[in-house]
Every structure is written in structure tokens, then in C-alpha cells.
């Protein structure tokens, strides 16, 4: 048992399958940079409080530098029997520098060590995601600006039934708003997780004269965590990040779903770039939007990670339990999934080919301008609910006759209600309806242009 850091208590080694089941090296080795950073800071703190000599500190820091070089060169001797990244680095350090390496773990447990590593890792991962979100938001802004022309109109839908026409630019900016909130959630999560568990030790703190404020400051944390039990036992910070990732992926999934629908022959609004589609092994004509479909599917994967970790922590007593080892694998996978999805959409969206004429015809159909007629009657003084019934009866008649709203004459309108006058006829044109939706946040070109200019400033494109 000498090769195991905790072997002194045990008379025999673990079962081979149990040892493999217990090991986390396959996924927590991703934290090696954070663990090295933490080790360096912890060593300097131990020296500052008199627990390491200058010579021991120098040896440890040189050893950690050597380990970093080995890992980057791919020559580091990872050993699964040492269970995790922490013990692998410590064991190798001791091999390189001797007894000083064994002193590095003074006043520290793997419990506070892994919690610190994970917070450091998430801090960096969030920064990367925020940069990717900014890049995708810029793409959405550019696409909105490119398609601001009122000729780029598509049907807006409720219940997946044609409802009212909207500008394509308005559609792009709708997803911009969602992604802006997604970025805000990640920023909030980063703010809350940016406290240091280091120094909480196993669960009760330590009797050594450590300086937790020193290590917190050197690792870029706002402050040390105030309760040692909370520091090692809590994973709400990971759940909060997963929740933000889940909501972010839901937004990307909704966008992907719409683009999948719009790219079908039945809709025919858009064509997906060849670089982000695949073919069929049997049907030569097929062009499948696989990347969009996978983004849609992988949203479920991230949701599963959130639900899974919630189930892990829901009944855990304080403080640390081995169950918490199950936090990293789903979290790391969810981060990678969201990261890749953001990158793919940022590359895919500029290559979409929008079919303006097909969109226009679809926006004209489905009686999407019926609300304009109801609003007209309401503006003339008729209670809106009554106006709604008048136009509803008119639409029913047109449906029965197989006619469109634009086919109506003034006489037919007045036959349904005498308040209809000559100025109602322009409302049967798509361009008129679009320009009328000029309320703040509406789809009128001037309203969309106003929001677009604000969005450009928000993402640094002004």
C-alpha cells in the first residue's frame, strides 16, 4: 500500500475493479493547469508563514515547472492507481524533489484542493464562453444589418401557425437578446463562484498558521470562503454554471430547430451551407442539416448534465462525499458542448442563403394581415373584441371561398362593417403592415434599426 497516499490505514489494497471505479484521472486531469497554479500559490503561502524554508520552496517551484513542461510535452507519467490529478502531480513532485514535495500538502486536503481547482477552471471557461457569445452576438448583429431591407420579411408564428409578418432582421435580433441574457447569467455565476475554498482543508479548517487571504488574492479570488464546511461541501456554483449552460443551449436549440424547419422544401425560406450539411448513403438528392440537428440534440445532453448533478447533491450530508467526484465529468462535457455549439453557429449563420421571394409569399399567405383590419376598426372606435369578431367572420368567408385578403374590394369590406373606408385598402399590403408595427421593440424597420444601432454599440461594432 506504500504507493497509495492514504495507504497507512489499510492492511490490503483495493479490489482492482473498485480501484478503477474510484479513479477520476480520466476526466479530472483536465484541471492540471489549475492544480499547478494552486500548488505554486500554496507553496509560497507556506513559505510566507514559516512552514517551508526558502530552499524547500525553491525546490518545489522548480519541480512544478518541470511537471508543467512534461505535461505540455506529453511525457508526464500519468498513473491511474494514484486516482486523480492531484495525487499524480504530488507523487511526481516528490519523485523530482524528494521530501519537500511531501510537505506541499501541509494544511490542505484534496477536498478544498479540488473545490479550488474547479472554481479556477470554471472562471477561465466562463471567460472563454463569454468571448464566444460575444462573437456570435456580433454575427447576429451583422446578419440583422445585412437583412434590414423591408423586402426581407418572413411569417412570424404562434403555435407554428402563420400569425403576423416580421422582418428577418427582427428575427435575428430576437436571438441576439436571448444570447445577451445568456452572457449575463454566466457573468453572474462567475461573480458568485469567485471565492476561495483553499485552506478549508478536509472540512474544519486547520491548526496551521496559514494565510487564506494571501492564497485567495494570489489566485484572483475576491476573498476566502467564510465557512469551511460550505467551502468543501457545496457545488451550487457548478449547478449555477450548468443552469446557465442549459438555458444557453436551449436558445441555440430553438434557433437550430427554426433553421431546420425553414430549410425544408415545405418552408423553403433558407438553404444551409454545404459545409454544415451532409448527404445520404442511399438517397442522392438529400442535403441534411446534421450540424443543426446535433445542436438541437445536444441541448438535451446539457440538460441531462444539470439534472444529473442536481440528483447527485440533493441528499448529501455535510461535508465532502465521494459522490461529488461526479460533478466534473458532466460539467466538463457540458462546457465543451456549449463551446462547440457557439462556434459552429457563428460559422454557419453567415453562410445561410435566404430566399426572399419565398419568404414574402409565405408572409402574405395565411391571412397574416387580419390583425391589421381588426386594429383599423378599433382605431375607428369599435371595441377591439367586436372588431376581432368582424374580421374573424371575414376570414372564415375567404377561407371557404379559397381567396386571399389582398383580393378584397372596398365594397366587400364595407359589407362586413360600414366603418371600413378607402384608407383600409393599403392595410392589405405586406409592406404597410410591417411599417405599422412601430411600437418600441416592434418589427417596423425604424424600430428594428433603432435597436440594431444599440446592439452594435453593445458588441463594439459601432
Curated annotation (Swiss-Prot):
GO terms for molecular function: argininosuccinate lyase activity. It is found in: Cytoplasm. NCBIfam families: argH. It catalyses: 2-(N(omega)-L-arginino)succinate = fumarate + L-arginine. InterPro entries: Arg_succ_lyase_C, Argininosuccinate_lyase, Fumarase/histidase_N, Fumarate_lyase_CS, Fumarate_lyase_fam, Fumarate_lyase_N, L-Aspartase-like. Its EC number is 4.3.2.1. This is Argininosuccinate lyase. It comes from the Bacteria. Keywords: Amino-acid biosynthesis, Arginine biosynthesis, Cytoplasm, Lyase. It comes from Thermus thermophilus (strain ATCC BAA-163 / DSM 7039 / HB27). It is an enzyme of class 4 (lyase). SUPFAM superfamilies: L-aspartase-like. One of its GO terms (cellular component) is cytosol.
Amino acid at each position: 500500500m506504500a504507493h497509495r497516499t492514504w495507504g497507512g490505514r489499510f492492511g490490503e489494497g483495493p479490489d482492482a475493479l473498485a480501484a478503477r471505479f474510484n479513479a477520476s484521472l480520466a476526466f479530472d486531469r483536465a484541471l492540471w493547469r489549475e492544480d499547478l497554479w494552486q500548488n505554486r500559490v500554496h507553496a509560497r503561502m507556506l513559505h510566507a508563514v514559516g512552514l517551508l524554508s526558502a530552499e524547500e520552496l525553491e525546490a518545489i517551484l522548480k519541480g512544478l515547472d518541470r511537471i508543467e513542461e512534461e505535461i505540455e510535452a506529453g511525457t508526464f507519467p500519468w498513473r491511474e492507481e494514484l486516482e486523480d490529478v492531484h495525487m499524480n502531480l504530488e507523487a511526481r513532485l516528490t519523485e523530482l524533489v524528494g521530501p519537500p514535495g511531501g510537505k506541499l500538502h501541509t494544511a490542505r486536503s484534496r477536498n478544498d484542493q479540488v473545490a479550488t481547482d474547479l472554481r479556477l477552471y470554471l472562471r477561465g471557461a466562463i471567460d472563454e464562453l463569454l468571448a464566444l457569445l460575444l462573437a456570435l452576438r456580433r454575427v447576429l448583429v451583422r446578419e440583422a444589418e445585412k437583412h434590414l431591407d423591408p423586402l426581407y420579411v418572413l411569417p412570424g408564428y404562434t403555435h407554428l401557425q402563420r400569425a403576423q409578418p416580421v422582418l428577418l432582421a427582427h428575427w435575428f435580433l430576437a436571438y441576439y437578446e436571448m444570447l445577451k441574457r445568456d452572457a449575463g447569467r454566466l457573468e453572474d455565476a462567475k461573480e458568485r463562484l469567485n471565492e476561495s475554498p483553499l485552506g478549508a482543508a478536509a472540512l474544519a479548517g486547520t491548526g496551521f498558521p496559514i494565510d487564506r487571504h494571501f492564497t485567495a488574492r494570489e489566485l484572483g479570488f475576491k476573498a476566502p470562503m467564510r465557512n469551511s464546511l460550505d467551502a468543501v461541501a457545496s457545488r451550487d456554483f457548478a449547478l449555477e454554471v450548468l443552469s446557465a449552460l442549459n438555458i444557453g443551449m436551449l436558445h441555440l436549440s430553438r434557433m437550430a430547430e427554426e433553421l431546420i424547419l425553414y430549410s425544408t422544401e415545405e418552408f423553403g425560406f433558407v438553404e444551409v451551407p454545404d459545409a454544415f450539411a451532409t448527404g445520404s448513403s442511399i438517397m442522392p438528392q438529400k442535403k441534411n442539416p446534421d450540424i443543426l440537428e446535433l445542436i438541437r440534440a445536444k441541448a438535451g445532453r446539457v440538460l441531462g448534465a444539470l439534472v444529473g448533478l442536481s440528483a447527485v447533491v440533493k441528499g448529501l450530508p455535510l461535508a465532502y462525499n465521494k459522490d461529488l467526484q461526479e460533478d466534473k465529468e458532466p460539467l466538463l462535457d457540458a462546457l465543451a458542448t456549449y463551446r462547440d455549439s457557439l462556434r459552429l453557429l457563428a460559422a454557419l449563420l453567415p453562410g445561410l442563403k435566404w430566399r426572399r421571394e419565398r419568404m414574402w409569399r409565405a408572409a402574405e399567405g395565411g391571412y397574416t394581415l387580419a390583425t391589421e383590419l381588426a386594429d383599423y376598426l378599433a382605431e375607428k372606435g369599435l371595441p377591439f373584441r367586436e372588431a376581432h369578431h368582424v374580421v374573424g367572420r371575414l376570414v372564415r368567408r375567404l377561407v371557404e371561398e379559397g381567396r386571399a385578403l389582398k383580393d378584397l374590394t372596398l365594397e366587400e369590406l364595407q359589407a362586413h362593417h360600414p366603418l371600413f373606408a378607402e384608407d383600409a385598402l393599403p392595410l392589405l399590403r405586406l409592406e404597410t403592415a410591417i411599417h405599422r408595427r412601430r411600437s418600441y421593440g416592434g418589427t417596423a424597420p425604424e424600430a428594428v434599426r433603432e435597436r440594431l444601432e444599440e446592439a452594435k454599440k453593445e458588441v463594439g461594432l459601432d
